[in-house]
Amino acid sequence: MLNQFPGQYSNNIFCFPPIESETKSGKKASWIICVQVVQHNTIIPITDEMFSTDVKDAVAEIFTKFFVEEGAVRISKMTRVTEGKNLGKKNATTVVHQAFKDALSKYNRHARQKRGAHTNRGMIPPMLVKYFNIIPKTFFEEETDPIVQRKRNGVRAVACQQGDGCILLYSRTEKEFLGLDNIKKELKQLYLFIDVRVYLDGELYLHRKPLQWIAGQANAKTDSSELHFYVFDCFWSDQLQMPSNKRQQLLTNIFKQKEDLTFIHQVENFSVKNVDEALRLKAQFIKEGYEGAIVRNANGPYEPGYNNYHSAHLAKLKPLLDAEFILVDYTQGKKGKDLGAILWVCELPNKKRFVVTPKHLTYADRYALFQKLTPALFKKHLYGKELTVEYAELSPKTGIPLQARAVGFREPINVLEII
């Protein structure tokens, strides 16, 4: 069965062929997806028999490797496959067979995306934030202080000028915004005075309008021409290593070239010496009706979000909301170290359910809870209890809390004593 899949098998690991692309700086980038089988914490050989018969206590692991020419290799977290699909049917799969099917599906999807990348008209995915409500100490160890900016709850957008002089405005996922003529008109005027190679990175926004309304306007072919473009960064495809503080200086110079813009704005920068100053600014911004704050490492390069990469040179500060929800079930994580670790399932008044990660339990405690907590014990001690949940925001589409973490039960309950 191994010979039915494209790729090479070596050292007990099967790797699909590399999918190669070229970065905007001209370097070759490679993405590889691999499958291995683990039994009792040991990688074991993959045999053809595993495609028809499961091996006791064995799980399959899928992972990817990504590297740019002359750069370090980044290895993803393991996705574990613990059971096949369609069990009991003619088309049933074993653990290993299912893992290979899943990996092949991801391989084909990535290959299609990369084929399309050659016709993406110069789109570079914007830099994404890694840290949430944490500012690394290294931000304050640079010669230049980090800067803080207002965080607007809008729609991410990047602007660039194409070879024919037309303005391209696209999303975080490299989807072109077809409307927004009021913004594109001003961008075209601005590009008459600046380096046409520069990309402007920002957010589509209208103050105090809900995100759902903003997204609807941004994605409409014909919009109401009310949205504004707030630019918080800029970059050049061949100068991605340029530090953040230098990019901000150039961005200020860009906006000095044309100061009569109505719908395009440079985001205001605030230099901070320590975490307390950043937190005070965050509190100020929230009072003003904004979502929070963004902190930028002064010496950080511009790191595009290829393959959903999140840059360690950005931090997002937002208030955590909290509310109480009814606990109705429990489950486990699906990938990596979360597999086998307990998760709570809560229910909204409209009966929609969502998963909550216990905040104050160690992984060891979560593993033990999932292993020892029976449905009978859960029903007797936990079902229907009110669970205090902190979260970043509610999904505008479903109303489900996002980034939800369980703080504790309303009534004092030590869940570890139950087991």
Curated annotation (Swiss-Prot):
Q: Which residues are responsible for catalysis? A: K151
Q: Identify the stretch(es) annotated as NTD.
A: 1-120
Give residue numbers for the site Important for the catalytic efficiency. Answer: N153, L211, L402, Q403
Disulfide bridge map: none
Q: Which residues bind a divalent metal cation 1?
A: E203
Q: Name one Pfam family in it.
A: DNA_ligase_A_M
Q: Which residues bind ATP?
A: Q149, K151, E203, F232, I294, K316
The record's GO CC annotations read:
virion component
Start and end residues of each stretch annotated as OB domain: 318-419
Give the catalysed reaction(s), semicolon-separated. Answer: ATP + (deoxyribonucleotide)n-3'-hydroxyl + 5'-phospho-(deoxyribonucleotide)m = (deoxyribonucleotide)n+m + AMP + diphosphate
Q: Which SUPFAM superfamilies has this protein been placed in?
A: DNA ligase/mRNA capping enzyme, catalytic domain, Nucleic acid-binding proteins
Q: What is its EC number?
A: 6.5.1.1
In its keyword annotation, does this UniProt entry include Nucleotide-binding? yes
- Domain text: The N-terminus domain (NTD) plays a critical role in DNA-binding, catalytic complex assembly and catalysis.
What's its job? Very low-fidelity DNA ligase that seals nicks in double-stranded DNA during DNA repair. Together with the viral repair DNA polymerase X, fills the single nucleotide gaps generated by the AP endonuclease. It is not essential for viral replication and recombination. Displays a very low adenylation activity towards DNA with 3'-dideoxy- or 3'-amino-terminated nicks compared to regular nick DNA.
The family this protein is said to belong to: Belongs to the ATP-dependent DNA ligase family.
Another remark in the UniProt entry says:
Consistent with its intracellular location, ASFV encodes its own replicative DNA polymerase and three base excision repair enzymes: a class II AP endonuclease, the repair polymerase Pol X, and an ATP-dependent DNA ligase.
Descriptive protein name: DNA ligase
* Organism placement in taxonomy: Viruses, Varidnaviria, Bamfordvirae, Nucleocytoviricota, Pokkesviricetes
- Annotated gene: LIG
